């Protein structure tokens, strides 16, 4: 029962997230030979104010 967690910054559309879940499921199923119904994809959308790189928040760039 594979679990895939994807963290990304806010701003993606519902259609983009739907496509991501579908395509990641396909790739994991193919490579691990796991049934699609056993694959869990967790999307963790982060606010730009809650994420920083090099000491700078993404919201401040």
Swiss-Prot record:
NCBIfam families in the record: PRK02220.1, taut
Signal peptide (from-to): none
Active site: 2
Protein's organism: Listeria innocua serovar 6a (strain ATCC BAA-680 / CLIP 11262)
Any one Pfam family match given in the protein's UniProt record, by short name: Tautomerase
Family stated for the protein in its record: Belongs to the 4-oxalocrotonate tautomerase family.
Classification of source organism: Bacteria, Bacillati, Bacillota, Bacilli, Bacillales
EC class (word): isomerase
Superkingdom of origin: Bacteria
GO terms for MF: isomerase activity
SUPFAM superfamilies from the UniProt entry: Tautomerase/MIF
Protein name: Probable tautomerase lin2709
Record-listed E.C. numbers: 5.3.2.-
Keyword terms, alphabetized: Isomerase
